[in-house]
């Protein structure tokens, strides 16, 4: 069988009727507030000193070193992160400078290649132009020579045709064929 709790169970024969708003005064409640009683003041001061001493010891030896180590570790981690960030920034700056340098070099090489290509194409075009010009000059000279020989041949034929026509005209008008020598003299006189 369970034993009753002496703190919550009233003593036998006690009045258990509860009246709301009514506080019953007993001998246990008489006197001053216990912390303010001067009879146990020295014991309270000793316990206060012991409690604060124990609290100070625990704070000094356990809590504060842990907090200090946490703060120190955090400061070290922050310092390491800042150093790493500075190093990464320096690397990024160096990479940016290297990129800019490489870009300028590439642009310079591209300009050089473009200029070289333009020069090569201009030289090739000039060579082709000169070759074509030489070829055209040769064809022109050949054409002029052909025209000259054909003109001379045609003029020779014209003289023959003119001589024949003049001979036919003189023969028709006079009824006699002209002699060849006088006909050649007359043709020579009209040619100059």
From Swiss-Prot:
| Membrane topology, record value | Single-pass membrane protein
Grouped into one coarse class, the protein's main location is: membrane
UniProt cross-references to InterPro entries, sorted A to Z: ATP_synth_b/b'su_bac/chlpt, ATP_synthase_B_chain
Can the keyword Translocase be found in this entry's annotation?
Answer: no
Q: Where in the cell is it found?
A: Cell inner membrane
Q: Which GO terms describe its molecular function?
A: proton-transporting ATP synthase activity, rotational mechanism; proton-transporting ATPase activity, rotational mechanism
Instruction: Give one Pfam family.
Output: ATP-synt_B
Keyword Endoplasmic reticulum in annotation: no
Say which domain of life the source belongs to: Bacteria
User: What cellular component GO annotations does this protein have?
Assistant: plasma membrane; proton-transporting ATP synthase complex
Ranges annotated as spanning the membrane: 39-59
Q: Which UniProt keywords apply?
A: ATP synthesis, Cell inner membrane, Cell membrane, CF(0), Hydrogen ion transport, Ion transport, Membrane, Transmembrane, Transmembrane helix, Transport
What biological function has been recorded for the protein in this entry?
Answer: F(1)F(0) ATP synthase produces ATP from ADP in the presence of a proton or sodium gradient. F-type ATPases consist of two structural domains, F(1) containing the extramembraneous catalytic core and F(0) containing the membrane proton channel, linked together by a central stalk and a peripheral stalk. During catalysis, ATP synthesis in the catalytic domain of F(1) is coupled via a rotary mechanism of the central stalk subunits to proton translocation. Component of the F(0) channel, it forms part of the peripheral stalk, linking F(1) to F(0). The b'-subunit is a diverged and duplicated form of b found in plants and photosynthetic bacteria.
Record family assignment: Belongs to the ATPase B chain family.
Subunit structure, as described in the record: F-type ATPases have 2 components, F(1) - the catalytic core - and F(0) - the membrane proton channel. F(1) has five subunits: alpha(3), beta(3), gamma(1), delta(1), epsilon(1). F(0) has three main subunits: a(1), b(2) and c(10-14). The alpha and beta chains form an alternating ring which encloses part of the gamma chain. F(1) is attached to F(0) by a central stalk formed by the gamma and epsilon chains, while a peripheral stalk is formed by the delta and b chains.
Q: List, alphabetically, the HAMAP family matched.
A: ATP_synth_b_bprime
Protein name (database record): ATP synthase subunit b 2
């Amino acid at each position: 069988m369970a034993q009753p709790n002496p703190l919550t169970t009233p003593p036998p024969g006690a009045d258990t009727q509860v009246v709301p708003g009514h506080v019953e005064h007993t001998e246990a409640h008489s006197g001053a507030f216990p912390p303010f009683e001067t009879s146990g003041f020295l014991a309270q001061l000793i316990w206060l000193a012991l409690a604060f001493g124990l609290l100070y010891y625990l704070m000094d030896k356990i809590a504060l070193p842990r907090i200090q180590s946490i703060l120190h570790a955090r400061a070290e981690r922050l310092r390491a992160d800042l150093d790493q960030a500075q190093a990464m920034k320096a690397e990024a700056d160096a990479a940016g400078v290297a990129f800019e340098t490489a870009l300028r070099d590439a642009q310079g090489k591209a300009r050089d290649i473009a200029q070289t290509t333009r020069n090569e194409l201009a030289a090739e075009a000039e060579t082709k132009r000169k070759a074509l010009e030489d070829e055209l000059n040769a064809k022109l000279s050949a054409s002029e020579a052909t025209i000259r020989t054909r003109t001379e041949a045609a003029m020779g034929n014209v003289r023959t045709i003119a001589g024949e026509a003049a001979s036919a005209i003189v023969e028709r008008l006079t009824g006699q064929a002209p002699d060849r020598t006088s006909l050649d003299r007359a043709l020579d006189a009209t040619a100059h």
